[in-house]
Amino acid sequence: MSEFSQTVPELVAWARKNDFSISLPVDRLSFLLAVATLNGERLDGEMSEGELVDAFRHVSDAFEQTSETIGVRANNAINDMVRQRLLNRFTSEQAEGNAIYRLTPLGIGITDYYIRQREFSTLRLSMQLSIVAGELKRAADAAAEGGDEFHWHRNVYAPLKYSVAEIFDSIDLTQRIMDEQQQQVKDDIAQLLNKDWRAAISSCELLLSETSGTLRELQDTLEAAGDKLQANLLRIQDATMTHDDLHFVDRLVFDLQSKLDRIISWGQQSIDLWIGYDRHVHKFIRTAIDMDKNRIFAQRLRQSVQTYFDDPWALTYANADRLLDMRDEEMALRDDEVTGELPPDLEYEEFNEIREQLAAIIEEQLAIYKTRQTPLDLGLVVREYLAQYPRARHFDVARIVIDQAVRLGVAQADFTGLPAKWQPINDYGAKVQAHVIDKY
């Protein structure tokens, strides 16, 4: 988790003093990516100047640049990379003229973004979440044990700061890369549809389904581990409440909770936005198919009329008897003439008319729990009420019962952050998820 100890003026003055600047045209960026790729194949992580020149030659050939000045241009590119702190140059008096080059952290960061981080891996994300879960559990256990300031710094603050926070940042970066990939997929689909939408339909479907699957896979993985991570963070937060000197731990835990909530929330929002775009593309394709179908028919009809004398044709048509609707749409339906009088047991009474009466009865019956200070299990209570009503009324009755119940009090288990178990409330598959109300 990024924290800046310097102020904005201090950072600006520091950047100006060190003359930081980055300029990477497409050919220089390609050269840097080539260097990073070749560097990754070496165990020592070092490259000679000759190897850098060879990498530059490959890039120059790909851009169809002249080979006559390859040495000068390669030397200029290498010096430019060193000046921008993308490469470090090491020289030795024993081997003068044979410098050794290593990628700087800045160079690794840029190339890592363009190369390694471009590939989404569910296994990688699962391993990251597994590591985070283990670190958080150990930190929560250490917080529960308690100890001196050194104990809190070493066993609680350090794992949260330098392991959990960094992995959260990595997951956040993965989400942001997925945002870019979504935009790239949208651009690809737009180009395909502009060229030849009939031939592009299958490609569009593939791009849409792959992106939807990746987003859903990412979100499912996050949600599966999210509850456990939040539970351990809450354990650490509870342990710090009795210590006035642990504000730094409490602040870090709060930042981690906010980061985790933001990651999971944006994952679901990203899926919802993509679903909307998916529907928009399919609607466009259906509209294009309908328009193209009508346009082709009209074009063929015009050609047939124009070439009739050269190529005569006969038109055969079928005229089926029309089905007439004898019902008068304007006729008003009168109960006394059409349906007659109904027995009292079958008289219809709108549910809205008895809603207030039913709510008052349920409120009076539920008040007994508050008077006796008895825990109220919503799952059991709702099931008992629904058994008294037909299936068509279950949704409305359940809503009234829940509305009246939550007015009585709250469930202390809600403050733990742990989800309640799903309980069946009727025989038709309906379920409710709620903790037992025990505080009125």
From Swiss-Prot:
Record's subcellular location: Cytoplasm, Nucleoid
GO CC annotations, alphabetized: cytoplasm; nucleoid
Keyword Cell cycle attributed: yes
Pfam families per record: KicB, MukF_C, MukF_M
BP GO annotations: cell division; chromosome condensation; chromosome segregation; DNA replication
Superkingdom: Bacteria
Sample GO molecular function, one term: calcium ion binding
Keyword Calcium part of the UniProt annotation: yes
Alphabetic keyword roster: Calcium, Cell cycle, Cell division, Chromosome partition, Cytoplasm, DNA condensation
Start and end residues of each stretch annotated as Leucine-zipper: 208-236
Family to which the UniProt record says this protein belongs: Belongs to the MukF family.
UniProt-listed HAMAP family: MukF
Functional description taken from the UniProt entry: Involved in chromosome condensation, segregation and cell cycle progression. May participate in facilitating chromosome segregation by condensation DNA from both sides of a centrally located replisome during cell division. Not required for mini-F plasmid partitioning. Probably acts via its interaction with MukB and MukE. Overexpression results in anucleate cells. It has a calcium binding activity.
Subunit structure: Interacts, and probably forms a ternary complex, with MukE and MukB via its C-terminal region. The complex formation is stimulated by calcium or magnesium. It is required for an interaction between MukE and MukB.
Protein name: Chromosome partition protein MukF
Source organism per UniProt: Salmonella typhi
Gene field: mukF
